[in-house]
A protein has these predicted regions:
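Phosphate- and divalent-cation-binding pockets in alpha/beta enzyme and binding domains
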Residues: 88, 121, 146-147, 170
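A short local structural element in Rossmann-fold oxidoreductases
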Residues: 23, 148, 172
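Short, glycine/polar-rich helix-capping loops at beta-to-alpha or helix-loop-helix junctions
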Residues: 85-90, 163-173
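Active-site histidine-anchored catalytic micro-motif
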Residues: 113, 128-166
């Protein structure tokens, strides 16, 4: 009996993007922008803590979905891990063997710092690991369209995972 072809999967999570998109989906349009200062100043405030808890992401579900495409050979999450909204996920992600890539606050790093760093790493990985067959991009903004297109041109199957209602249609169209 012939062995099925081994599929090798790389997962890239723009964690800030997903956390903010999901928070807004749970609490209403632009809710994170309105709550950001309160979250930063006092994440332990009971009302803030409850809003964060209600907007928790099922990280395991995302990783399990990506693993359904094959062997996970690398999984990276990009965010400012010192931010209270992201820090609560650290142990969960580390337990799932996710590499945490530290991005410094937006003022020092630039608004789309995660987009640039994630895209550069993904393209580098495709050349460094030529046996990668699948690339999973966990994000929702259209800035990732060129990355999805490049991955496809380099022969990779591209999966996009985003928050319903806030994922750019162009990103969905660029993925397989």
């Amino acid at each position: 009996m012939a062995e099925p072809q081994d599929t090798r999967v790389a997962v890239y999570l723009d964690f800030d993007n997903i956390v903010i998109s999901w928070y807004d989906r749970v609490h209403g349009r632009n809710a994170y922008g309105k709550d950001r200062q309160r979250i930063t100043e006092n994440p332990n405030d009971p009302e803030v803590a409850e809003r964060l808890k209600r907007a928790m992401i099922e990280v395991g579900a995302i990783i399990d979905y990506a693993a359904s495409f094959g062997t996970l050979v690398l999984t990276r999450a990009y965010a400012d891990w010192s931010s209270p909204v992201n820090a609560v996920y650290r142990s969960q992600l580390v337990a799932r063997a996710v590499d945490l890539v530290q991005l410094f606050p937006a003022a020092a790093y630039a608004k789309n710092g995660a987009d640039i760093r994630l895209a550069v790493d993904a393209v580098e990985d495709m050349f460094r690991l030529p046996d990668l067959t699948h690339v999973v991009i966990v994000a929702g903004d259209s800035d990732y369209v060129p990355l999805a297109q490049r991955c496809k041109r380099l022969g990779r199957y591209v999966i996009g995972v985003g928050v319903a209602g806030s994922t750019a249609k162009s990103l969905a169209a660029a993925c397989d």
